[in-house]
Amino acid sequence: MKRFLATSLLILLLAGKALACGWGPTHNYYLFSVYNRALMQNQFIDRINSNWDAYTNGEVKEYDHDKLLAFAKRKGDTQMAEYLTLLDSYLNICERQGETWNYPTEEEKMEMDAKLKNIRQVTSQKLKTRLRSQNALLHMRANMLLGRHADNIAFWTSTVADQYPNSVYKDMMKDIYAGALVKQGRRDEALDIYAELNDMESIRWCMWDIWNVKGISKLYAESPNSPALPYLVQEFVNDSQETLDQSKWNDDGVSSEYKKEVADFISLAERAVAEGKTKTPALWKTASAWLEFMFGNKQLAETKSKKAMEMEGTDRMRDNARVIRLFITASNAIDSPSFDDFLCNEMQWLSEKAKEESTDGEWNTYWSYNHYSEVFDRMVFQPITTHYKKAHRNEIATAFYSLIDPPSSELENVGSVYSSNFYSYLDYGDVDDALAYQSFIQGNPKGKLEKWLHERAYKSEDFMNDFVGTKYMALGDWPTAIKFLEKVPLAFLNQQNINPYMGTRSYSVEPWRNFQRESSWEEEPKVILTSNKKIDFAREMIDLETKLAIANKEAAAKLAYEYAIRNYQASYKGDCWFLTHYASSTYDTLRVGEKDFLACCERYLQKAAESKDFQMKEKAYYGLAFIPTEPWRNGEWDSSSNDWVYKTNPASTQYKALKRLVDLERSNPGKTAEYVSKCDVVIQFKKQYQ
């Protein structure tokens, strides 16, 4: 079994995204989003770093005390050097106070307070210098850590608010001022400031004690346009999805208490829309629609989602309403040209939104921190797949998968396709699905949706011919496999991830006598192929099958043995799994609809065992004993004896094969081959079998 360990690594690398037990995206992302989640990050760091970049003429791109101090000294900037020294002292105190595993001692706290008081004193004397904004910010920071919140309110009001120029430093001071207001019980004023600064992280911190419908309802009654409400509504809706997702793992499902909580929220949302006090009814109506859908009222949800599209709200809220309407409509839709057109328009819009929100112009699900690319992903994995499979138009769903994380079409990057969602989806389908997709990319698209997809879908003919041919290899349909594989150039095969295995392993090697495994965990080097091993194999199998059909019994036994070897090697257990698949794992099993190469191997080893030749019979029995379809014994750990306890399975195929092998050996003393007599499994079996 050790020889499979390295290949199991390959499957993790190639298809890790699709493994249930490995890392991978959920594909059940939150759809409800009424603010950019980047707002939950620090809103000031990038602006601060831009200032450092400008100050050093691009030499230092982000805060680095030592590099910045060296630059300031080299420039002769005494004010900046003094400021950086104070800033470093402050940041060190912040880091020390943030330690959760090693809290500061009372002595350390006194020492830190003394340093903060010094920072406060020194910066107060530098409020008319060139760096007055930086020093004023540091002054307020020191006050904050000292708990002097009233001082910060007074300092902002009397000194900063009307006298300091607009800058990132002033915005940070205003943020600290808002925090001081919270400490003084003036939360509503603070919330307005946090909203103005797009500081959703602080809004969340401010609202830590409001999380249920009762709290949200109270806040709405007091302030129907509170800046905290969008955050609280989004949290409630997405928490509801989380609760539903978690309920799938228990027998009781969602509790009746929680269902009532959701129903109460829907009532609140509808009341908020009806009363007309909110400036953002789209927020509430969309929340109501999405909760209705998640909890099973799908037609009502669709009606509500369409109404939400007509209501007022921020641009983000209106986009959110559009996302929810799209998902619900696609989930409910009956296949028709009009639905195709609707879906095309909406998915085009969605892809453009994903590009807009991305900072680097990329929008695939895996490498971008992007809400809209995740919506695209969930749309494809859920309603689009369900809809087009049901409509027997799976090629449309397949084309959509190729848009999630588009594989490279460049020859040197052939390997990228095998780690894509497109490949995973195509691979778990059958050959008819692959043929339908190939026909789609080769044909003339009809309708708006098909044309849009056809322009963007992955269309490598080399990949598709190799893929379809390999699917036929897995079915044991050699002539049809050859027809497709012959169209694939060696240049393509030389770039595949399976190339090292294809170039170094032989399907004629007896797997029960010789293991063909890589020498290390290092990546195997590519091999320049001189022929397509899949075609070579298919032709040999056709030749063997032809000869087997006409051979006499003794000749047929030898041919059957060779045929059995090749069947095993082509199976998911074989060293030449690359003949029928693109990856291998110790967790692999026979796929539905594919040829059972292991069962075929067993059948032909049985035929080989009918030979009168001792060596052939011995090899056949040994091969049968090697195949662990039904193990000859099972082991359980016994804690009392602190050892393994084994129970034999006389009815298993492996037990019977080992019995025949040992019986053959005992009835032919002196003839046993060394590889049999030294086999650990045979030795263990003989101890049990007398």
Question: Where do the PLM segments sit?
Answer:
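Extracytoplasmic/secretory-pathway proteins
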Residues: 20-141, 146-690
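N-terminal signal peptide c-region/cleavage motif recognized by signal peptidases
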Residues: 13-17
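Sec-dependent signal peptide recognition
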Residues: 2-8
